[in-house]
A protein has these predicted regions:
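Glycoside hydrolase catalytic-domain groove-lining segments
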Residues: 326, 330-334, 340, 427-430, ...
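Aromatic/acidic polysaccharide-binding cleft in carbohydrate-active enzymes
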Residues: 93-94, 480, 511-617, 627
Length: 709
């Protein structure tokens, strides 16, 4: 992920008159769609987007007072295929994306690696019942001399190794009976089973310990508790189960030390019994599964150039806590590693796409090849045996591998010029394919054509996909929100230029584009707004029109993250953004082939992105069985609905259409934790046939489904 919006390609701005002409030509050419006739019943899907920020001028269909439009589809003509991989997702170790959003683990800083407070307790942990306890009778010490596990395999990052810590607990005479430590803000539900464990090393401690879920406002009110008999000696794992009798979004998890003596505590865990494969929260899991992602990209993003995969395999409690150099130097637990990611991806129906570290933070080509062997090698191989020992004897069969992330950017470790990256790419490609020749490799591309040209010339024969990322924000909009609504059409022309470059350097149509990060950098109140969804929907229409080239795409980010995860999750709940809703609509209505279509629409002008930009953007596609047509339509007008005549040629359409729409009274409308359903998908039925009329609300995204034969 880039820290700023993507730079324009070199020499991209032409004189205004040429720009206007190119908009008209590119847009009209891009919207002609067709499909083959089918004798069986079939359905057509139409998606329409109306932008919400412009005042129309005299358009090709009449004066600005006339807000009518038309879509004419020729189902006998196919313009291009649409990749089944087109709608994927992107997941990164970023802020609370995984450790506080995706992961079901309820205990924060469970390995006690964060710096301690004045009481000697690591971050998120506090004395119980409060700081008035007798410090002498119950003392805590953040100890780096003893921690679990006692030893870990070394992974050389070229940095000073981070010491492992655990709290040493000294319980002496004079302490009150119910004393210990706790962690606050633990959301619990009545009747749900919570499975936990902790590791203890007992020196001369005598007695039991107690774990409990309690009220944070009614001190001492216990929802559930369990006693653990402590056995003297070296590190030992103690498991427990808690089933609270009451629900509480802000409960406390308490560990009490009623005995006397010294012990060490480490690796505390508490997971709800409903956790999904990979240790993922059930509510987040269900929202992701509803998106029907074709693939999920991980671990980054920028952080891919920080991450060392060996940190995240093996027994959960023996993994590293590492410093995330990309995102505020936060400490990251390794609970969600390779095994968990793959299990989670497959459980939601997605193919895993893994980004390997290229020369960042001490990473090597041998390490990348070893990662491929861990995932895809036989159990008789060195790293396949490691995978089998971790509980997965059969190879995972990971198909998609990305070789580095945004190497051209000085914000990532291992960044370089294009020549150096191309040489490194070839080394990595040879080593990784020597392990598994069947894998598909994704190379780092850019919005700068000079980078792409250099990489393709030197490494094109080894590339399956070229990854390009798009971010657009406040700086690029230059105070004109209409620029946002027009920007996807600039990218449509850019893809045509990339395609021309590919055909010049690499004969045939073998290399495809992966737009596996796209997003916006707007103020929060607009980042999650309907306005953002209009931009996203128009861009996804561009992806479908560019289907001969663009095969993979993913919005940034999936959960929390930066600049605007489409699922926003905190410990008490979640909401989805309007961009999530249009992602869901587009993914659910995936046609196999794009049909020829012509569109007539009012237009608007912008300060940076050209003139005569149509308010209406639409694509039509047909399912593989020929029984449905989907029309995806975006109305970007901020003020006017579009009365739209839809004509379908080359098939016989059914008498009723299904229309699903994302809109709201205001362009700035958004969801939040207090109002998670302020913006939602609205469904209605409408009369249809060979020619019919629909009203596309102002600033809206609609998907129209037609049964055809």
């Amino acid at each position: 992920m880039r820290r700023q919006a993507a730079a324009e390609q070199s020499g991209d701005r032409s004189p205004h008159s040429k720009k206007v002409a190119s908009y008209k030509t590119a847009f009209l050419q891009g919207l002609r769609m067709t499909t083959n006739r089918s004798k069986c019943a079939s359905t057509v899907f139409i998606a329409v987007i109306l932008s919400g920020a412009a005042v129309p001028h005299v358009s090709r269909v009449g004066a600005q007072t006339s807000q009518t439009a038309s879509i004419t589809i020729d189902a006998s003509k196919v313009e291009n295929r649409i990749s089944p991989l087109l709608y994927g997702q992107f997941l990164e170790f970023m802020y609370q994306g995984i450790k506080g959003g995706l992961n079901a683990e309820l205990i924060r800083n469970r390995s006690f690696e964060e710096a301690p407070n004045i009481a000697g307790l690591s971050r998120y942990w506090e004395r119980y019942p409060d700081d008035r306890n007798d410090d002498y009778a119950l003392a805590f010490h953040w100890d780096d001399a003893s921690a679990y596990p006692p030893q870990r395999p070394k992974v050389d990052t070229g940095e000073r190794a981070m010491k492992e810590h655990s709290p040493r607990v000294d319980a002496r005479d004079g302490a009150i009976q119910r004393h210990g430590l706790y962690q606050a803000r633990i959301p619990i539900r009545a009747g749900l089973e919570y499975r936990g464990y902790l590791w203890l090393r007992a020196d001369d401690y005598k007695g039991a310990i107690t774990v409990a879920l309690e009220s944070d406002v009614k001190q001492g009110e216990v929802y559930a508790s369990a006693d653990i008999n402590v056995i003297a000696g070296d590190w030992r794992k103690y498991e427990f189960t808690l089933r609270p009798e009451h629900s509480d979004p802000l409960a406390q998890f308490v560990i009490l030390f009623p005995g006397r003596g010294r012990l060490w505590l480490d690796q505390v865990s508490l997971l709800p019994g409903e956790a999904m494969p990979g240790g993922v929260r059930r509510d987040v899991f269900e929202k992701i599964k509803a998106l029907k992602p074709a693939f999920i990209r991980w671990p980054g993003g920028n952080v891919a150039q920080d991450y060392r995969w060996l940190w995240g395999v093996g027994p959960r409690d023996e993994r590293f806590t590492w410093v995330n150099l990309s995102w505020k130097n936060e400490l990251e637990p390794s609970d969600f590693g390779t095994d968990e990611f793959i299990l989670f991806s497959r459980a939601v129906g997605a193919e895993p796409s893994i980004t390997v570290n290229v020369e960042g933070r001490g990473a090597t080509v041998e390490e990348a090849a070893a990662w491929v062997e861990y995932c895809n090698g036989p159990r008789t191989s060195k790293y396949g045996a490691m995978r089998a020992a971790n509980g997965h004897p059969m190879p995972f069969g990971v198909k998609f591998w990305e070789v580095g992330n945004e190497i051209w950017g000085d914000w990532v470790r291992g960044h370089s010029d294009a020549d150096t990256y191309a040489r490194n790419y070839n080394r990595y490609a040879r080593a990784m394919r020597a392990v598994d020749p069947s894998i598909k490799l994704i190379a780092v591309g850019d919005n700068n054509m000079n980078w792409n040209r250099t990489v393709l010339r030197a490494a094109g024969e080894n590339i399956d996909y070229l990854a390009i990322h798009h971010y657009y924000g406040r700086r690029e909009m230059a105070g004109d929100p209409l620029n946002l609504m027009a920007r996807p059409l600039f990218l449509e022309r850019f893809y045509a230029q990339v395609e021309q470059l590919l055909r010049e350097i690499v004969p045939g149509e073998r290399i495809k584009l992966a737009i596996n990060e796209w997003g916006l950098d707007l103020p929060d109140e607009r980042q999650y707004s309907l306005e953002s969804a209009l931009y996203g929907a128009r861009l996804m229409n561009v992806f479908e029109r560019s289907g001969n080239l663009v095969e993979m795409s993913a919005v940034s980010d999936l959960v929390n993250g930066w600049p605007g995860g489409i699922i926003q999750a905190n410990r008490q709940g979640l909401f989805v953004s309007p961009i999530y809703l249009v992602n869901q609509l587009y993914s659910e209505h995936r046609g196999d082939k794009r049909l020829a279509a012509s569109i007539s629409s009012p237009t608007f002008d912008t300060s940076r992105e050209g003139s005569d930009v149509p308010y209406l953007d639409a694509v039509a596609s047909r399912t593989a069985d020929g029984r449905k047509i989907f029309i995806k339509a975006v109305n970007t007008s901020p003020t006017s609905a579009l009365t739209t005549t839809i004509t379908v040629q080359g098939v016989i359409a059914g008498s009723q259409a299904e229309i699903e729409t994302v809109t709201a009274p205001s362009l700035t409308a958004s969801n939040d934790f207090a109002r998670p359903d302020a913006v939602f998908i609205k469904n209605k039925a409408a009369r249809s046939g060979r020619s019919f009329v629909v009203t596309l609300p102002k600033h809206s995204v609609s998907v129209i489904t037609l049964a055809v034969r």
